[in-house]
Amino acid sequence: MDVVTRFAPSPTGNLHIGGLRTAIFNFLYARRHGGKFLLRIEDTDLARSNTAYLESILQALKWLSLSYDELVYQSVNVNRHREVALELLNRGKAYHDNGAVRLKVNHDETVKFSDLILGEISADGDSINDVVILRSDGSPTYMLAVVVDDHDMGITHIIRGSDHITNTFAQKLIYEGMGWSLPDFAHIPLIHNTHGAKLSKRDGAVDVIDYRTAGILPEAMFNYLLRLGWSHGDKEIFSIQEAIDLFDITAVGKSPARFDREKLYSLNSYYISGLPLERIASEVRSLVEEKIIVSYSAFIAFVELFRKKCSSIVELKDNLQFCWCTDSCLEVDRLLLQEVLKLLENTDWGPSLQQILKEYISLSGFSAKEVYTNLRMALIGQEHSPSVVEIMQIFGKDVVLKKLRNSLK
């Protein structure tokens, strides 16, 4: 059997991290088994559907390199949905109710299905409603449309959140009512906050776009969501290809995973420090509208120097503002900087710059903290930074002297 999975978001809001994890699991399962991963936009709610939300979904998948094999819009299949509703009526599996059509449920029978993650799940028939499948205005409901589309698209494995379990019982009856083969189901436990409650906007950002805007790298987001409920031994870092090779849906945990922003940012820091320097520089540059006022080689060197202390691209960008901004409102010790300027003007510092500054500190009466802090403020407009000596060496003597003179004007 050729595996076919699908991710079926609705363009009625921005894609949230739970939805993105579902997309990742569907993508990996299909690729792991040499199958197809389809994207279905469930846009039948015309009043709430929005092209901006649709674009955010498409961009999020592109951002994480989750390539899909086919894009389907549910709204184009409305006539097919109605056709199936009428067929269920003809088969005695549905009935009219005040102009609408409802699924006929045998409330005396137990409905059960086997889940690839949670095992066998069952529900008493009297707990399953005779759900509306066709509204009185002739429009199909989600409950019907999703089954028809999954069948017609040849979906073999439905991987989705555990909040859909109650839907599955009624949907199973639609499959059986039409005489269709049932796909395999895998319901992923929901994502909770660190306190064990359902994740919500009160816990901070939950939309994918918010994390992208905050400077999370796609590699970090992919890797973090991948391991949010799934693991492979003690391995913590996965490339997409490694994840494809190792992913097993039956290894997904049965309990809700807890979303920890600190762990996500820690993982992001790992990628900021470890990905190719040119890539990180490009990520920073994409956030800056202003012209870089240092040389490109200096900019690259500053990215390398500062990236080790940053947990997001936005934080790194903020630390590098001196590369495109000349304004600084920090007060400096003019006497100290005048002395340092005079010293540096008359010294061939080269590789001995560290020693030159140490000797000055020992003779000047100023502390090392005072000297280095004032140099930082004059050179980059910050009180704290990596090695000020390295910063000076990257700028070069001419630029350092110019900046010191400007700070004394």
UniProtKB/Swiss-Prot annotation:
Residues that coordinate or bind ATP: 201
Plastid keyword on record: no
Ranges spanned by the short sequence motif 'HIGH' region, renumbered to the chain: 9-19
UniProt cross-references to InterPro entries, sorted A to Z: aa-tRNA-synth_I_cd-bd, aa-tRNA-synth_I_codon-bd_sub2, aa-tRNA-synth_I_CS, aa_tRNA-synth_I_cd-bd_sf, Glu-tRNA-ligase_bac/mito, Glu/Gln-tRNA-synth, Glu/Gln-tRNA-synth_Ib_cat-dom, GluQ/Sye
E.C. designation(s): 6.1.1.17
GO terms of molecular function: ATP binding; glutamate-tRNA ligase activity; tRNA binding; zinc ion binding
Coiled-coil spans in chain: none
Purpose of the protein: Catalyzes the attachment of glutamate to tRNA(Glu) in a two-step reaction: glutamate is first activated by ATP to form Glu-AMP and then transferred to the acceptor end of tRNA(Glu).
PANTHER family for the chain: GLUTAMATE--TRNA LIGASE (PTHR43311), GLUTAMATE--TRNA LIGASE, MITOCHONDRIAL-RELATED (PTHR43311:SF2)
Protein name: Glutamate--tRNA ligase 2
Lineage of producing organism: Bacteria, Pseudomonadati, Pseudomonadota, Alphaproteobacteria, Rickettsiales
